[in-house]
Amino acid sequence: ESLLSAFDLTAREAEVLYWVVQGKINLDIADILGASPATVKKHLERIHGKLGVETRTAAAAMAVNRVRALQRSG
């Protein structure tokens, strides 16, 4: 939930980002969410835009850092 508000993500984008942080590849994420790999790729493109990053690794790192900061502050 904190990722939703911290980065203005949709619920589905937050789910995709969660699985990226867990180290899953697009095909795995698609299977988990019952979506196509192309849909997962599109969600990742939107996530990258909202976070201002270019790679899934950068997106994952930013998400982990934000969650840690939120846990420390509250």
Describe each region flagged by the PLM.
Residues 1-42, 50, 64-74:
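Helix-turn-helix DNA-binding segment
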